[in-house]
Amino acid sequence: MSSVDRRHEIVQAALRVIAADGVSGATTRAIVAEAGMSLASFHYAFTSRDEMMRELVAYVVESETVAAFSALRFGTDIRTSIRDSLTAYFELAVVADPGHEQVMFELMQYALRTPGIEHLAREQYDRYRAAVSGLLETGAENAGIRWSLPVEDVARLVVTISDGLTLGWLADRDTAAAMRVIEFAADSLSRLAEPAPTNSTVRTTTKERSA
């Protein structure tokens, strides 16, 4: 087994262990037992449990980002792009695998409560916001708009909405209500969009300034 494959198998095993026993139960011994590997295999693949946790966060965020990007359709308006991306995240990341989302929330809480690894929570949300910023920039270019606020601020708002959407659904499993939230979020976020300046607009503005 290659090092890349070994790392992947360990991350998958860690996700299963955390979903079943929580982050505190995800010891290196428990993870390698779930993966069917030796303890030496873990230390061959990762230098520490902290490094493995970072890899786990990166894996889940990347999976969610791929799902959201795959929902973007060229030629659609920004509201449709927002709705489709949130729906893809909700259906493919939350509903299809709620255990992953529970793991991510628990990982953040565990990091915040554990001295020395608080940075993991910050890194987790840095990754979320960076991924969403990329989606927002792609969606804006596709729809011919620009954001009336800095894209980093819009990304922070989207992450806040998706957190509430996810936690609400994990608590009540009311999919219909979650879809209504997505529609409302698409309405609200699309109001932060404004037409992007065209080449003719730029030329006109330049002439006016020169006059």
Where are these predicted regions, by residue range?
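Alpha-helical DNA-contacting segments of helix-turn-helix folds
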Residues: 2, 53-60
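Hydrophobic alpha-helical connector segments
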Residues: 55, 69-101, 151-158
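Helix-turn-helix
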Residues: 6-9, 13-55
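Conserved alpha-helical segments that form or flank metal/cofactor-binding pockets of metalloenzymes
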Residues: 60-70
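Hydrophobic core segments within long, regular secondary-structure runs in both alpha-
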Residues: 79-87, 129, 133, 179-190
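Short loop-to-helix capping motifs
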Residues: 48, 110-115
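Amphipathic alpha-helical packing segments from all-alpha helical-bundle domains
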Residues: 98-105, 115-141, 153
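Hydrophobic/aromatic-rich alpha-helical bundle segments in the mid-to-C-terminal region
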Residues: 116-122, 140-204, 209-211
